[in-house]
């Protein structure tokens, strides 16, 4: 059917790859959009055998089909209806073979060309990565913007922990920091089908999904389709849907119309349109939301671990196990796979919970950890001597055995618990235990090109927000929370040999707030005196997020 008519279709109009949306062609093998026409195996005796089976066991086969579902021949016919995918997508999806050069990054300017000025934009960002993933250019645009936070199952254990009241926090924060008035927030998990109906109700008649790579746009499309299977379809053009028989079961219908989903960033290459119960949704390719996101995950991280990192689910993220680490004068550190090194101040006791795959390790110092990485790849390990004892715990490639490949991020002072977020990697929850005493600043050393931010624990913030909002029934109470202190902050990258990080941090803080003096706080207080005393409430000195 569809396969047989492909040559005719190519003769009069183009068709797009089902997975990435690029225009298909079968002329240039190494060109974009190349696909191979499937060749169906011909079995001369198959037709005669099928006829004999129908004559001998026709009624029995009909009853069995009703009880067990479609037979193999029917399944093959359904597969023929699935639109074709290009070779790049087929290799990536089914064989995990891909060349990163075929997955180039897009910019907001690139993808924005296809978004009308009066469009309603739904800005999608993974909740676990907050505040990174939100793009101030989209939030401050002249378009009507709604925010959809995805992958909430990586932060909370059940959807009831994310009521709509939580939106008051984000509404107040964005108004305070960016002076934008956004009131429409939704929180969902496509994997768990959480709050998908709520998202569908919030969509306008025509919507454009904008967000970074792997934000969850295509996954949301598929989750929406599952709520109204037979009233959802992929559109060949803005007014024409791909035709399907009326007797298809739900799974076959979804196979034909679903969006292409992959853990590989920049998988979608061209905008694709879908009709979800009369609402037109434009799935726009992911674009680079980071200002300086240059880290090459594919060359720096072992491929098997990178796959685990990108496929992380709630079981990985919502672990309850923590690792205790005592800070030392030598700089004892905590790492997962050699991808980063968290260094607590000397004489402090801390509990670290990882929200990423891999087993944590502790080393006497960063230099010792880097030495282990280099030793894992040294020539002294071969088939006879075996591998390094810690080889299974190292997930980075040799280039990350060099200290110069890392940036020293100093974390602003905090009291109690914080979360350290690494873009596209995961996050750590750090709990400072024992009696309060300021003994120095915490640090995390991360490869160049990976952005880092810190925040108060999201679940704690949500709990406080819900209480404040329900006490008054107004956003005003929540707005007062935001005015009182910042809840998110950028880190402070410093030289490896900086000996007075607190003084340097103050200097950098003044530079960052020079164009927004109203953001400055506690400048008339002695910083050391302020952070050396336990406060009734957090003060979050020098906390400031650079949007």
Curated annotation (Swiss-Prot):
Function according to Swiss-Prot or TrEMBL: May be involved in the mitochondrial lipid metabolism.
UniProt entry keywords in alphabetical sequence: Mitochondrion, Transit peptide
Chief place of localization: mitochondrion
Which sequence ranges are marked TM in the entry?
Answer: none
- Enumerate the Gene Ontology biological process terms: maturation of SSU-rRNA
For the keyword Mitochondrion, the answer is: yes
User: Which GO cellular component term is one of those annotated?
Assistant: mitochondrial inner membrane
Coiled-coil segments on the chain, per record: none
Cited InterPro entries: G_CP_dom, Mito_lipid_metab_GTPase, P-loop_NTPase
- Which family is it part of? Belongs to the TRAFAC class YlqF/YawG GTPase family. GEP3 subfamily.
What's the protein name? Genetic interactor of prohibitins 3, mitochondrial
């Amino acid at each position: 059917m569809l396969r047989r008519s492909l040559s005719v279709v190519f003769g009069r109009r183009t068709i797009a790859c089902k997975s990435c949306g690029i225009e298909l062609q079968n002329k240039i093998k190494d060109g974009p959009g190349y696909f191979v026409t499937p060749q169906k195996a011909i079995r001369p005796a198959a037709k005669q055998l099928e006829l004999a089976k129908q004559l001998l066991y026709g009624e029995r086969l009909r009853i069995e089909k009703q009880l067990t579902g479609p037979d193999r021949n029917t399944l093959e016919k359904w597969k023929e209806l699935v639109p074709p995918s290009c070779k790049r997508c087929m290799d990536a999806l089914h064989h995990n073979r891909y060349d990163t050069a075929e997955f180039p990054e897009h910019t907001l300017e690139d993808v924005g060309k296809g978004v009308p000025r009066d469009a309603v934009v739904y800005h999608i960002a993974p909740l676990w990565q907050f505040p990174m993933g939100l793009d101030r250019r989209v939030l401050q645009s002249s378009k009507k913007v709604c925010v959809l936070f995805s992958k909430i199952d990586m932060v909370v254990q059940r959807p009831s922990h994310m009521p709509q009241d939580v939106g008051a926090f984000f509404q107040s924060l964005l108004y305070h920091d960016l002076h934008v008035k956004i009131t429409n927030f939704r929180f969902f998990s496509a994997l768990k089908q959480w709050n998908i109906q709520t998202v569908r109700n919030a969509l306008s008649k025509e919507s454009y999904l904008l967000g970074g790579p792997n934000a969850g746009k295509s996954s949301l499309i598929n989750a929406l389709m599952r709520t109204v299977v037979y009233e959802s379809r992929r559109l060949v053009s803005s007014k024409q849907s791909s035709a399907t028989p009326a007797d298809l079961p739900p799974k076959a219908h979804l196979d034909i119309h679903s969006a292409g989903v992959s853990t590989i960033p920049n998988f979608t290459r061209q905008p694709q349109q879908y009709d979800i119960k009369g609402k037109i949704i434009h799935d726009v390719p992911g674009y680079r939301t980071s200002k300086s996101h240059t880290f090459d995950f594919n060359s720096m991280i072992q491929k098997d671990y990178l796959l685990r990192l990108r496929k992380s689910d709630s079981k990985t993220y919502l672990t309850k196990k923590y690792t205790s680490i005592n800070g030392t004068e030598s700089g004892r550190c905590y790492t997962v796979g050699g991808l980063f090194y968290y260094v607590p101040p000397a004489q402090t006791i801390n509990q670290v919970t990882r929200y990423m795959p891999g087993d944590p390790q502790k080393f006497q110092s960063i230099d010792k950890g880097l030495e282990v990485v280099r030793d894992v790849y040294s020539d002294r390990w071969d088939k006879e001597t075996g591998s390094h004892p810690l080889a299974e715990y190292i997930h980075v490639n040799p280039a990350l055995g060099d200290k110069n490949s890392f940036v020293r991020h100093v974390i602003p002072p905090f009291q109690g618990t914080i979360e350290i977020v690494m873009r596209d990697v995961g996050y750590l929850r750090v709990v400072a235990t024992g009696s309060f005493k300021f003994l120095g600043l915490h640090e995390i050393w991360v490869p160049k090109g990976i952005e880092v931010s810190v925040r108060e624990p999201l679940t704690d913030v949500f709990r406080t927000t819900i209480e404040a909002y329900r006490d008054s029934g107004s956003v005003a109470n929540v707005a007062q929370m935001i005015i009182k202190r910042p809840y998110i902050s950028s880190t402070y990258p410093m030289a490896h040999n900086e000996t007075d990080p607190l003084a340097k941090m103050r200097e950098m803080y003044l530079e960052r707030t020079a164009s927004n003096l109203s953001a400055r706080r506690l400048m008339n207080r002695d910083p050391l005196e302020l952070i050396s005393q336990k406060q009734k409430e957090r003060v979050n000195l020098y906390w400031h997020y650079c949007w």
